[in-house]
Structures are given as structure tokens and as C-alpha cells.
């Protein structure tokens, strides 16, 4: 008899309003899906929508709802991997057709529009950054004042425990 898997819902954790949320659990129950939607893409789009309604779009506003997608190893932040990570986000629906995918250029995440007819992608709004913990020295001294959240994905690895440094 197969046990029914309950899809993960981040709403109860969000209600706690904690500065740091550590989420771990069984594989394939929707943790990443919930986090990338509710803590990465949606907050940016909701703020943008509020700014447009208040006629504050343009250089007169600062969008601080951007995020950093953090992984342990630089191999985990290739453009292909990151774009595949966001492939299940229905960007077209969320942006009312303005964009249809999320792309990476120089480790910056963008809402983008892919044109099937031409095979070309046009970058739009910058929504975040992607970084690897193993290359943190490259980011020291950088300014990320527009970042509100850091999403550290897959922080627990099977078999590759980081040994204690002494």
C-alpha cells in the first residue's frame, strides 16, 4: 500500500514572520516549488504591480523584492540548471503574457520573453541573482541592497558532508 504524499505548503511558516526559515523534509513534496513561487517570484511581481497602480514605475522607485538563489557548488548554478529550476513557474500567466520564462545572464536572473518563431530571448526585469557558496569570495564587497531574501536550495547533500574546518 502506497502512502499518500501531502504537498508542501509554506503558508504556515510564512505566518511566523521569522528572519530565517529552515525548511527540510522528504524529496519531491513541493518545498522548492513553494519557495520559488511565494518567496522569490511573487513578491517581486506583487510589488511591481503595486508600484504600477500608484504610478511609481520608472527611476523613481527602488524594488527591494529581489532575491538570491544560493547553492553550495558552482556546478549547481549553470545557466541551464537555473533556468530548468524555474521552468515550472508559469511566468506567462503571472505576468499576463508580458514575459514567459526566467533566464540567467552573468549570474543575474531576469523575467524574459522567448520568441518561438525567431528563437530569440529578450531580457526584461531583473528579479534576482544566483550564487554558489563555494565561490563566496568572489561576491565579498559586492552590494546587494535590492535583495530581501536569500533562498539557499539543497543545503543538505547526501554523502558530501562539509568537514569541520580547524
Cite the ranges covered by each PLM segment.
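Phosphate/NTP-binding elements of NTP-utilizing enzymes
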Residues: 1-166
Amino acid at each position: 500500500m502506497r502512502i499518500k504524499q501531502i504537498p508542501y505548503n509554506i503558508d504556515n511558516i510564512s505566518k511566523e514572520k521569522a528572519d530565517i526559515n529552515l525548511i527540510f523534509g522528504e524529496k519531491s513534496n513541493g518545498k522548492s516549488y513553494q519557495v520559488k513561487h511565494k518567496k522569490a517570484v511573487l513578491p517581486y511581481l506583487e510589488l511591481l504591480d503595486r508600484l504600477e497602480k500608484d504610478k511609481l514605475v520608472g527611476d523613481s522607485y527602488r524594488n527591494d523584492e529581489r532575491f538570491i538563489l544560493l547553492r553550495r557548488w558552482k556546478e549547481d548554478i549553470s545557466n541551464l540548471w537555473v533556468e530548468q529550476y524555474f521552468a515550472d513557474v508559469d511566468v506567462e500567466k503571472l505576468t499576463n503574457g508580458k514575459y514567459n520564462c526566467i533566464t540567467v545572464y552573468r549570474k543575474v536572473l531576469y523575467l524574459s520573453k522567448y520568441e518561438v518563431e525567431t528563437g530569440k530571448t529578450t531580457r526584461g526585469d531583473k528579479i534576482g541573482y544566483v550564487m554558489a557558496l563555494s565561490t563566496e569570495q568572489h561576491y565579498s564587497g559586492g552590494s546587494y541592497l535590492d535583495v530581501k531574501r536569500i533562498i539557499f536550495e539543497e543545503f543538505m547533500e547526501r554523502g558530501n558532508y562539509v568537514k569541520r574546518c580547524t
